[in-house]
Amino acid sequence: MQSRITAYWPDGSVKWTSHTANAALLEQEIEVLPKVRKQLKDSELRDKHVVERNKERIKLVVEKDKERIKLLAGSLEIDIPQDGTSLFHRITYKGKVFLTDARSVLLLEEPAVWEGKNLKIEKEYSPKITEIAVEEEGELRVIIKYTGHHELSGEKKIPFIIRMLVGLNSSQLDFVHTFLYDGDEDRDFLKGLGIRFCAPVTGKVYNRHVKFMGDYGIFHESLAQLLSWRPRVPQEVYAAQTRGEVLEPQGEEKEIVEKVIKDMPFWSEYDICQDSASHYSIRKKVKDSNCCYLDCLQGNRTEGGAAFGSEQGSLLFSLRDFWEKYPSGYTFRNLDGDLAEATVWLWSPKAAAMDFRHYANRGYNQVYYEGYDYKGATPYGIACTSEFSLRLSGKIIPSDEEIREFTEGVKYPARYVGTPEYYHKLKAFGYWSLPAHGNETENWLEKQLNHAVDFYLAEVEQRNWYGMFNYGDFMHTYDKERHQWRYDMGGYAWDNTELVPTLWLWYAFMRTGREDVFHLAEKLLRHTSEVDVYHMGRYKGLGSRHNVRHWGCPCKEARIAMAAHHRFYYYLTGDRRLEDIFLELKDNELSFLEKDPLGDFYEKEEMVYPSHARSGPDWSSLCANWMTQWERFQDTKYRDKITVGIEDIKKAPLKLISGPDFEFDPLTVHLRYIGERAAGGTHLQICMGSPQVWMELSDLLEDEEWKQMMADYGRFYYLPREEQLKESEGIIGEREFSLPFMAAAMGAYGAWYLKDEILAERTWRHLLHSLISEGNHDGFLTVIAAGKGNRKELVEIPWISTNFVAQWCLNVIVVLEFIRGKLPKDLAAVDILVEEMVVEGFRKA
């Protein structure tokens, strides 16, 4: 097993580790135990006798010089040039050359007008690799990281990061492809993006095959199908060919076959394109560029398994989430020649180009819930990551079952995770509860938590939330009259992490271990960490608030990009792409010099510090980034950034209760108290993941005063208004402590820490009242709307909003951990509790 440490506890002990092993050799459950192994020195590695004695330990070898990197991975050898163009020059498996080149492909489309006519100019860019790094090197696996961009006539566009994962004696290569958009949205439309491989093909043309997965079964053809009129090829020969057998005709059969192949078309090129979530097409053509394509097959969805081969061997391809992240595809070209080309299209040029422009030339602040009335949309700096794999095979074409199994393994790779009980015992990611069914109310709460997750699992499919730039995200708010999410209404459209559905889903997985919840959270993670945030440019380290377009809102904030959204997936999987993102975030407080999150609320000339940060969600998001950098590298500089802010908050009149608006100096990370003001509402201080970050930090810092401040915050939030004014001596003024169900985690923490039974009761009352009133226990009950939403029977929750669902579920998960014992035992007691609810001084959810 190949292992590495990914995080440390403050005392230097190991917190998280990442491991690589051959899952095919392991059972469904494994136990990982620490063991100290002697490492061979470089001098020993050069000693043949030492090598022989330790041959079982010396596994994968990486040789490097100025011109190339050579990987010796048992039966697999890879030559990687350092010339800046190709990912590799040759891949040999079991002594046979399978691939001779691989390089990034980019097509951009530019709209133009000529003599009053609208034109589209398609431009193909060449790749330029600027850096090749051996990112991970171990006994079982090597990861090669390529960084570069594309060029045309001196113009550089669309940076990329490509990772190639190579395993010992493995016939499979895994790729993680990331591109960043740095184009001009008015003229740089994405027309095609992928990686093109060159593979030698040999032998008779009738022994060359292609296969594509369909909706049902496998589409399979030979380049020269031995089905003829005159002379007629024997049926058994054609039947053997369609089974994928190597044909070696003899005698009269050979004469007939050789005669017919002189007078038939050879299908030199095959193309498959999934152009929507509900349609794909397979086409083919002969080599002549002046000839048309023939339609082979139209279908609904393909999982993306594909292969082609010859007597040389075959290549299998599988692009993960093939139809979900449309438009995707493959083009296999020159199959009847000596060197075939196989392009894996992450964005297929057979589909319409991606238009990155905004939907309007202004913002709609009040009416459509957008950040401001001015336009602030920009796609410059967003990214997208895709994953695909290829496998080398000695067969002329793999079997249908092999393609299915390979594709299934790419879509759902084997991952080992701990049990919920194990993670809970070690307080992984702070405070959260395990499911329990000890009484009627607990059963009802667990039922609602499951209903909520199940609803969104189904809603992704029902609402077609698919496509490269959309897949993974949810919509924000529902329109019950149109029976549709408000996809066209400014800030009500795509959610973009608003009120942290990310944390809800990850904690839901942590406590249940449900595989489907893991996948739902994983897709949300991959989208929100890439498309919703900026990885370069003036907004690097910030994300865009919820909008019709993922990059549409003029509000660019740290909370959308914060590491807290992504730490779960990183520590559970060791995903290397997230390491890039964490490095982007570690010092992203400097982005506050470019974009003051409260810049439109305060006069610049009256400020002492150059920017602002609310204690939550702005400063708390920075804390998540700093905490991640601290625990990954034991870099106490980032711990100190956190404590600087904590000490500043301690000096405020009401400590954590104060503000939450502060002036902020990104260079010193100091906060300056400027009074009791809450731009956007006090609830924003605690509904964007702040409680979860603060609670986890509280145990890492061992600062008792900080814990007391958190507890006091939860207590104060639920005080009657007159008591709030009295305790604060009136300095809170008109500041509302609104939407109290969103503060339930803080209230529960306070009740637990202070042993305050009255606070525990108030916390449960507000949290339960937000979903139960007047004896109605329907919760997340779905209803059927016939003939709506282009469905025979539309399943909906007419009042639903992702904001409410995410916050209610997240708070329930945390509150149960702290004050489960104060939960009413049955729903009749719950009804009595919520009937006593006093709403004066609070804004209803």
Give short role names for the model-derived ranges:
Residues 1-17, 355-367:
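Solvent-exposed beta-strand/loop surfaces of large extracellular or lumenal domains
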Residues 170, 175-176, 378-392, 494-522, ...:
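Conserved beta-strand->loop/alpha-helix structural units within folded catalytic cores of enzymes
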Residues 72-418, 471-477, 493-496, 530-531, ...:
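Beta-strand/loop-rich accessory regions of lumenal/periplasmic or secreted enzymes
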Residues 37-74, 394-429:
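Terminal connector regions
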Residues 298, 304, 348-349, 356-368, ...:
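Substrate-binding groove/exosite segments of carbohydrate-active enzymes
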Residues 2-5, 424, 454-490, 531-552, ...:
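Glycine- and aromatic-rich loop/turn segments at beta-sheet edges
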Residues 399-410, 628-680, 685-845:
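Terminal, non-catalytic domain-edge segments
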Residues 24-42:
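Surface-exposed interaction regions enriched in Ser/Thr/Asp/Glu
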